[in-house]
């Protein structure tokens, strides 16, 4: 019922046996509205071929993602055919790469290395 009533479906779940291809031909068919689907979780949660068909058939309003089933994306991934589509946005999966996030990463790493040296030195 949620899929049938949703205007936006935003995916934020881990990829596991239960979530692999959670968005697939069958779940897309249950969507009565033309939702916008956003995948910032893992690429394998969306069946690439089913999603490509849904975009091309105007079954969904659009798709935005920063993840793919295989990373880096493979040449045979159906989503590549959508790279210039006006209702599709792909962006790099690099939210962790901001200056602030990198500084935090280096601080944590430095503390862990220092703690290791202190314990073993």
Language-model region placement:
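A short, aliphatic-rich alpha-helical micro-motif
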Residues: 2-4, 28-31, 82-83
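Short, well-ordered turn and helix-capping elements at secondary-structure junctions
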Residues: 15-17, 27, 42, 94
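Short amphipathic alpha-helical segments, especially helix-boundary/capping motifs
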Residues: 11, 25-28, 86-90
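Rossmann-like NAD(P)-binding element
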Residues: 2-22, 39
């Amino acid at each position: 019922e949620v899929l049938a009533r949703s205007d936006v479906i935003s995916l934020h779940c881990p990829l596991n046996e239960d979530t692999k291809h959670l968005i697939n031909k069958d779940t897309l068919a249950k969507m009565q509205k033309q939702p916008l689907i956003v995948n910032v979780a893992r690429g394998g949660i969306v069946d690439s071929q089913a999603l490509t068909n849904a975009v091309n058939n105007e079954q969904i309003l659009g798709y935005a993602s920063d993840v793919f089933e295989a990373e880096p994306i493979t040449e045979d991934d159906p989503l590549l055919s959508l790279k210039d589509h006006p209702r599709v946005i792909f962006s790099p999966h690099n939210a962790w790469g901001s200056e602030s996030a990198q500084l935090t990463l280096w601080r944590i790493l430095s503390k862990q290395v220092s703690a290791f040296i202190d314990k073993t030195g």
